């Protein structure tokens, strides 16, 4: 039986994938921070006769310690992991800079560090599966944002947009570094941009932007059911190359600073130091 681990598996795209794989007979481990959402997913699993294959793990992935604890829990309860899907995200485009209890800027911690810890931490469990794949869901192919090498925690000149875009670019580099570091690993790392998808995401935005985003979503957004279909195809038939990027079904060239190998390895080493010390 396949094991599919999905962060953000209790809502939006992650939930869509969780329900799909439960229906397909896989064991699904869904991670989220809200117990009520986990309970609702388990109820849906029971409704499709998959209660014995559905697991909800509550974790606040803004915390490196929580992400590491999650790795340990998954390693000790799952003999192998076939698919790791990284969807946990909460945009903070406005408002003041906030810092986690471990001292990291919020977007850096949730949208990037947790994905770094889970990708590297679960590598061995993934390598025990026949066709392992990591799908890192974000915005590859969007030419915005950069790594602020001299101040990645954005202690100076912070803006929520800057932090969010930095976390996206960091995830592009995470895939490149992963492939460079483990060239002989069978794990396929897919950076994935789903396009505009109608999820709960706008409800977490501040009021004026929420209204605008919802209006734009009503015109432009794909449903979760439709958006999940090309994701499933890639997850079930991962590309042969170790690192790839897609926007929906379209393969993206790994060109430009977002996919630069030197920058990727530089960020890897910087992150390794941060995670080891668990402080910026
Ligand atoms: N929707 C789009 O149009 C779109 C476009 C481009 C890229 N994406 C990317 O697709 C991915 C999924 O987005 P979505 O729209 O499906 O999001 P969503 O509907 O808002 O779901 C986000 C998920 O992340 C979890 N989460 C948030 N904060 C967390 C925390 N601190 N710890 C653990 N889990 C946490 C949420 O669970 P809790 O609420 O329980 O914490 C929820 O399950 C994201 O990476 C996003 O950047 C989405």
Where are these regions (language model features)?
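Active-site Tyr-X3-Lys motif and surrounding loop/helix of classical short-chain dehydrogenase/reductase
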Residues: 69-76, 95, 102-109
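C-terminal helical subdomain
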Residues: 185-187, 191, 211-273, 277
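Canonical Rossmann dinucleotide-binding motif of NAD(H)/NADP(H)-dependent dehydrogenases/reductases
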Residues: 1-29, 33
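Rossmann-fold scaffold of SDR-type NAD(P)-dependent oxidoreductases
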Residues: 7, 79-89, 135-138, 190
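A short, exposed helix-loop element centered on a Lys and neighboring polar residues
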Residues: 119-120, 176
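Catalytic loop of short-chain dehydrogenase/reductase
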Residues: 90-97, 105-108, 127-186, 193-208, ...
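Rossmann-fold cofactor-recognition segment
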Residues: 47-65
